[in-house]
Regions:
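Short aromatic-cysteine micro-motif
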Residues: 16-38, 62-115, 120-132
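Phosphate/oxyanion-binding loops and surfaces in catalytic or ligand/nucleic-acid-binding neighborhoods
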Residues: 37-42, 141
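Sec-dependent N-terminal signal peptides
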Residues: 3-13
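Short beta->alpha transition motifs characteristic of CBS
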Residues: 140-146
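N-terminal secretion targeting segments of exported proteins
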Residues: 1-2, 175
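Disulfide-stabilized, aromatic/cysteine-rich ligand-recognition loop
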Residues: 15-18, 26-34, 61, 79-88, ...
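Core domains of carbohydrate- and sulfate-ester-processing enzymes
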Residues: 43-71, 153-160
Length: 191
């Protein structure tokens, strides 16, 4: 008697489609909720100072500058993008919120479909997160992968066509993982 062996190959296909992400700027209020919930101390708070950009070319070190008082004097407004945060701070927020930072490439892929006003040409003050395109409002920290340097995306209110060209995708600006500034914030990937 012959035995017939039937081999059945089953190909499993994923039932879910690739994630459809959006990008969203983290506001002062959202960051405050994180701080209140965790007691986290930011890099700027730890150091007791941070950089405050005065214009596209000049900055100064200001004691007491942090996410609550980005210029060291005035209290942050809840609807504005959180600033004076470092990559380390952004990562801790992401862990708490269960979200991720975009890579530089993903950032530009997602912001290209936002048709709201791009802030540039030295528009001051920083605009509310809901009223403008995130490009050009504050620099956004992106996920650097294995690099020790963090590439900033999007440009800031200090950028213009005559200066840093920050709102152009091919612009390269890097900071270390502990640097904050009055015009550096972060955006997250959302589903």
């Amino acid at each position: 008697m012959k035995k017939i062996v039937l081999i059945l190959f089953i190909t499993l296909a994923s039932c879910s489609s690739p994630k459809d992400y959006n990008i969203k700027t983290v506001s002062v209020k959202e960051f405050r909720d994180f701080i209140n919930d965790t007691g986290y101390i930011t890099s700027a708070e730890e150091y007791g100072w941070s950089f405050v950009q005065e214009n596209v070319y000049d900055y100064k070190v200001v004691n007491g500058a942090n996410w609550m008082k980005p210029d060291g004097i005035n209290v942050s407004i809840d609807s504005l993008p959180v600033t004076q945060v470092s990559y380390k701070d952004a990562i801790e927020y992401c862990k708490w919120a269960g979200v991720e930072l975009p890579t530089y490439e993903k950032y530009w892929e997602l912001v290209s479909s936002d048709d709201r006003l791009i802030v540039s040409n030295n528009m001051y003050p920083i605009s509310s997160v809901k009223s403008v395109n995130i490009v050009g409002n504050v620099w956004d920290i992106t996920e650097p992968g294995n690099s020790d340097q963090v590439r900033l995306a999007g440009g800031s209110l200090f950028c213009s066509i005559d200066t840093c060209h920050g709102t152009q995708e091919d612009r390269e600006l890097y900071v270390d993982k502990e640097t904050g500034n009055i015009h550096i914030g972060f955006s997250i990937l959302t589903e």
